[in-house]
Amino acid sequence: MEKDPKERREEEQAPVQNEEACPMGGGEGPKPRENVRGDWDPPAQDFREDMPNGLVNNIDIIDGDADDMERFMEEMRELRRKIRELQLRYSLRILIGDPPHHDHHDEFCLMP
């Protein structure tokens, strides 16, 4: 037998055991925190004094790596220049009609 719609709604809204029934809707939820003015420390001017020695040493190493990075970037620029030059040479050979010369190092001959 079908239950009356009113009875079904009451069953659906029945609170679970050990749970308070709370109305659906606005209700009282958590309130937003208000700005609390308190004492605050301004940011440290020299951040190294607040850091452990290990981190300060790492920063010194990172500063030293700047030279390595500059060297690396210079090598990359040099490689790009060489690649561009080789590509240009190859393109010019194709345009001129001069096929690349094979050195035949990878070929071998079987003698009878």
Curated annotation (Swiss-Prot):
Presence of keyword RNA-binding:
no
Please identify the protein, giving its name as recorded. Protein BEX5
Q: Which InterPro entries match?
A: BEX, TF_A-like/BEX
ATP-binding keyword on record: no
Residues involved in Zn(2+) binding? C109
Q: Where is this region: His cluster?
A: 101-105
Q: Where is this region: Disordered?
A: 1-56
**Keywords from the named record:** Cytoplasm, Metal-binding, Ubl conjugation, Zinc
Q: Where's it mainly located?
A: cytoplasm
* GO terms for cellular component: cytoplasm
A GO biological process held by the record: signal transduction
Q: Which GO terms describe its molecular function?
A: metal ion binding; signaling receptor binding
Specify residue ranges for compositional bias: Basic and acidic residues: 1-12, 30-51
The organism named in the record is Bos taurus
Spell out the subcellular localization from the entry: Cytoplasm
What is the recorded post-translational modification?
Ubiquitinated. Degraded by the proteasome.
This protein's encoding gene = BEX5
State the family named in the UniProt similarity comment for this chain: Belongs to the BEX family.
